[in-house]
Amino acid sequence: MPTIETRTEPMVINMGPQHPSMHGVLRLMVTLDGENVVDCEPVIGYLHRGMEKIAESRSNIMFVPYVSRWDYAAGMFNEAITVNAPERLADIKVPKRASYIRVIMLELNRIANHLLWLGPFLADVGAQTPFFYIFREREMIYDLFEAVSGMRFINNNYFRMGGVAADLTYGWVSKCLDFCDYFLPKVDEYERLITNNPIFIRRLDGVGTISREDAINWGLSGPMLRGSGVKWDLRRVDHYECYDDFDWEVQWETKGDCLARYYLRIREMRESVKIIKQALEHLPGGPYENLEAKRMMEGRKSEWNSFEYQFLGKKLAPTFKIPEGELYARVETGKGELGIYLIGDENVFPWRWKIRAPDFNNLQVLPQLLKGMKVADIVAILGSIDVIMGSVDR
């Protein structure tokens, strides 16, 4: 009796750009052989808005409100690098109090970023309940942002060259300390709900593994790099702001799979709380930005077009010119290395403003991770990368 043979041909399907697990307008052209992934091609660009070109036709103070739309889960980091690059090129000193306030805001935003990653990621792999608990704590962080800047999610417009836009409001420090004391037990609660769940572990353990060498060669950064055994954190490497004033540890894992990246981000939230509490308890006095004291000391001798008038004499004059030169500045966001390559030519507008987005680089490794995996693993691997398409497409 002849046997019946089943012949299969590769099938190309499109996931996105409207798929609920795509984390934005990302399109994946996936080639399947049955349930197995043969190839994957990410298609990007649906959210491109020309942010680099916009930056080259705006002064710094005009451009800061735009930058929340790169990575809209990490608006404070976008603002930080937007002011850090011209500050370093012009050698502008930031007061100690302003630097502490910046660190507090950045670490709060890091926690909010990880929470926004954790909730949808767990929902993608089938754990629906923790999503609501996680977003409850995330809203509390946005309450703190609203109290100090007037805005919650994006458009905080809080960072300025030389400092921050406004000092911390009355009672804000105690509210933030209360949040830190409240939040740490909640992280333990997330772990009780998720970490030892056998279904969760089977979905992630050994899935989407990246070796140490591949992570370095692909130019990965953030949890994608540290989860593969590379102890690299720009807060330690570049010593920017005042991170050296605090006692904290760089978190890293060696296994390089989705589960390792989950463990890493959970521990990073605890380290961020540790940094915030230290910054609040040792918050120095003094100005929160460079003000007009130096110019006022000169009296009537001060020149209207001097550096002191254009920068120190005002919060930031629209006529402040970016000095001639080039510089690459970078910060460690919740996703990795966010960098700006800046070229100034003694003009109000930058001559070149190149954005190095962390999730754009991290996304490039996705086809390698998906080959040979199952269809059900696609959303788990993509979710573990933590991609925001506003940052990828810019």
From Swiss-Prot:
It is a peripheral membrane protein. It catalyses: a plastoquinone + NADH + (n+1) H(+)(in) = a plastoquinol + NAD(+) + n H(+)(out); a plastoquinone + NADPH + (n+1) H(+)(in) = a plastoquinol + NADP(+) + n H(+)(out). InterPro entries: NADH_Q_OxRdtase_suD (IPR001135), NADH_UbQ_OxRdtase_49kDa_CS (IPR014029), NDH1_su_D/H (IPR022885), NiFe-Hase_large (IPR029014). Keywords: Membrane, NAD, NADP, Plastoquinone, Quinone, Thylakoid, Translocase, Transport. Its EC number is 7.1.1.-. GO terms for cellular component: plasma membrane-derived thylakoid membrane. It is an enzyme of class 7 (translocase). It holds the Pfam family Complex1_49kDa. It is found in: Cellular thylakoid membrane. One of its GO terms (biological process) is photosynthesis, light reaction. One of its GO terms (molecular function) is oxidoreductase activity, acting on NAD(P)H, quinone or similar compound as acceptor. PROSITE patterns: COMPLEX1_49K. Its main location: membrane. NDH-1 can be composed of about 15 different subunits; different subcomplexes with different compositions have been identified which probably have different functions. NDH-1 shuttles electrons from an unknown electron donor, via FMN and iron-sulfur (Fe-S) centers, to quinones in the respiratory and/or the photosynthetic chain. The immediate electron acceptor for the enzyme in this species is believed to be plastoquinone. Couples the redox reaction to proton translocation, and thus conserves the redox energy in a proton gradient. Cyanobacterial NDH-1 also plays a role in inorganic carbon-concentration. Belongs to the complex I 49 kDa subunit family. This is NAD(P)H-quinone oxidoreductase subunit H. It comes from Acaryochloris marina (strain MBIC 11017). The lineage of its organism: Bacteria, Bacillati, Cyanobacteriota, Cyanophyceae, Acaryochloridales.
